[in-house]
Amino acid sequence: MGNYKPSIKQYVVTVKAIKSSQFGRLGICAVVLLFVLGYPFYFISNNPFDTSIRYQYVDPYNDTTRKYTTIEKQHTDIGGNGTTILYPKNLQLDQTALSQLLNTTETTNPFVQYIGNSSSIAFSQLNQTLVNHSIQVFDPFSNSDNCSDLMTETQLTISQNIIIKESFEIMVKRLMHQLDTEPAFKELAPFFQNKLSLHLRMRSYHKHFYKFARTSVWLKDYGVHLMISRVIYSQKGKKGDPQISLLYTQLYDTNWQELTNTDLLVSMQDITGEYKLEKLQFPRFLPMPFYYNPKLTKGRWYGPEDARIMLVKNQLDMEEPVVIYNSYHRQIANHTTTGKTDGSVELNFEFYRSMFVGWPFRYQLGKSNTDGFVDDRFDNVKFTRVAELKIHNQTRASIEKNWTPFVDPSERDPEDKSLYIVYQWDKLRILKCDISNLVTDDGFIHYSACRFKQDTKHDEVEKVGPIRGGTELIPTIINNKQLWVGFLRAHIDKCGCGKAMYRPNMVVLQKTDMGTFQVAYLSSYISFNIPVPGWKTHEIQCGKRDPNVLIPNGISNWEVATIDGIERDVLTMTLSAADEDNILMDIHGLKTVIKNLITNQKHGNEFNSDSVQMKCVVAYSIEFCRAYGEEQARLGLTGGWLPSHN
C-alpha cells in the first residue's frame, strides 16, 4: 500500500460514527485537560512563587549589632473585649460612672487613670551612652560668596539609635478585623485580593507590607506616645509599586514599649462640633477618607502619604493631635448635559495630589471632600475629619507635597487658629492656613484657606529646591529670640551614591523684629551614625538605580530635665532608613548648641537674600554624598557599580 491520505468525506463519515456518549466523554476529558494545564498558571498569577511557595520567613530584627524597642504582648486579642481603658489624669469621674458611660464593666475592661508626671523623658534616656557628632551649619548673615565664611562646625551630643520593633502579625490581624467590622474600611477589601489570611499563614507579610515614616507626639495627660506610621501594600511584593497607603496608629510608654489592646478615653468632636467622651482602641488604622478605585491602580497611589503628626491647642485649651499629609483626590472640573429629557448631567473630574490636615480626635460623615461629590454608600459612615490645605484665590496645582508645618504659640487665643507652612525653603515662602474657620467656593466642599504670609517668589517659575519636607518645626525661645527647630531632608540626584541620596539637615527658623521669618541656621547632610541598608538589597549600597535614603520624620518630644541641679534638654526624633527601618534617636543639649551659635554669630544682622546659604548647604551635602559613595565602593558594597556624580 502507498501513502494513504483520507479525504474530507471519509473524515465526515468517521465523525458521524461517533456516538453522542463518546462526545460527552471527549468533552469531559477536554475540560479536565484544560484545568490541569491552566490552573497552575491561574494559581501562579494569583499566588506568585516568591510569596506563596518559595518564600522563607526571615526575622527582620535579628541583627545583634543593633538595639530594638519591645512590644507588650500580654493582650493581643484583636477585636476582643479584654482591653485596658486608659483615661487622662485631669478627668474627674469615678470608675462606676465611666462604666455606665461606656456601657462596660470594670472586670471586662479595667480602667487605668494616668497619675504620673507630664514629662516624656524616661530615666533610661538620662543614663544613655552619648557620643559627639560633628555637623556643619551655615548662616545667611554675610555678603560673602565663600561658603567657609558662612560655615560653623559644631558638635551634637547624640545617643545610640534604636530600631522600633514591629509586629506585622498584629498589624495584619488588626487590618483584617477593621475590614470586616468597620464601614470606613469595607470598600477597601478588593485592594488586598483576599490574600491577608495567606500572608499570615505563610508569614509573607514583610514582602507585601512596608511600614515607615513614623512620627509621634507625647500625650502628657495619658503618659503615652501616640505614633502614626505610613503603611503601604503592594500586591506584587514590590516596595516601589504599592497600590494603597494607610495610616496606622500605636501607643508607646515612656520606655518606647508598645502597648497593645489599649483604649484611650478621649474627647471626640462629633459632626456638630460638640465634644463627647469616646474610647479609641489601639493599635488601629485611622479611618482616613480618600478617593480610590480598586479597579484602576496603575500609576495611582491611593491614600495618605508622608504624614506628620503634631500638637495644637483646641478651643477647650487642650492639646490635640493633627496630621498633615498629602493625598490623591479628585474634584469636579465641570459638567455637561447629556441631552436626555430627564435633565441629567455628566460630571467631568480632575485628579490632584494635594495637602490635607486631619484631626484624629474628630469625625466627619462621608468623604465628599476627597471624592468630589456625594456617594450614598458613605453618607452615614464616620471618617477622620480632614480638610484640604488650599492656597486661596489660586488655581489648584496638580501636585502639592513636602510642606513643613509649624504653629506660633504667641498667637494662641486660647486655641491655635492658624497653621503655618513653609512652602519653599530656597527663597523662603511661608503660608498661613486658617484651620478654625473653613471656607467654601461652591457651598459644598469646605477647605482651609492658605494665604502667603511671606513670599519672595520671583517672576519666573521656579522648581522646588533639593531641601524640602522633613519634620514639623518645634517652637522655642533662646536669647529672647523666637525660634523654630526641625530637621529637613535634602534630596540630591546623582551626587555620587546611586540614583539619589536623602539625608537630614538641621534647620533653625527665626522670627525677626519686623515679624518676618528667616533661616538663621541650616546644616549640610547629617549621618547621625545610622547604618542605612540598601534600597532593594540590604547589602548593596549606592546601587546604580537605587536611592540611598535616611529621612527625618518627626520630633517626638523636646523637653528639659534637671540632673544634679543642671538643666539638660533632650530631643527625641524618628527617622526612616530605606523606607523600612523606623529609628529612634535622642539629641542632648541642643538648646545649648543653638544658644552658642547665636551668641557667637560671626556676622551682623545683614541678611543675604541670594540663597548663598542654600547653595553652600547643597555643595557640602554633595561632598558628603560623594565621599560616602567612594567609601562604599572601596568596601565592595556597591554591587559592582562604581559611584559617579555630576
Curated annotation (Swiss-Prot):
Membrane-spanning residues: 26-46
GO cellular component: membrane
Disrupted gene: phenotype observed: Leads to the production of phospholipomannan with short truncated oligomannosidic chain and impairs induction of TNF-alpha production in macrophages.
Pfam families: BMT
Entry annotated with the keyword rRNA-binding: no
Keywords: Cell wall biogenesis/degradation, Glycoprotein, Glycosyltransferase, Membrane, Signal-anchor, Transferase, Transmembrane, Transmembrane helix, Virulence
Residue intervals on the Extracellular side: 47-646
Bilayer disposition of the protein: Single-pass type II membrane protein
Localization in the cell: Membrane
Cytoplasmic-side positions: 1-25
Disulfide bonds: none
Signal peptide location: none
Positions bearing carbohydrate: 62, 81, 103, 117, 127, 132, 146, 334, 393
Sample GO molecular function, one term: mannosyltransferase activity
Record GO biological process: cell wall organization; glycosphingolipid biosynthetic process
The enzyme's E.C. designation: 2.4.1.-
Regulation: induction: Expression is induced in biofilm.
UniProt cross-references to InterPro entries, sorted A to Z: BMT1
Family: Belongs to the BMT family.
Stated name of the protein: Beta-mannosyltransferase 6
Organism: Candida albicans (strain SC5314 / ATCC MYA-2876) (Yeast)
Gene: BMT6
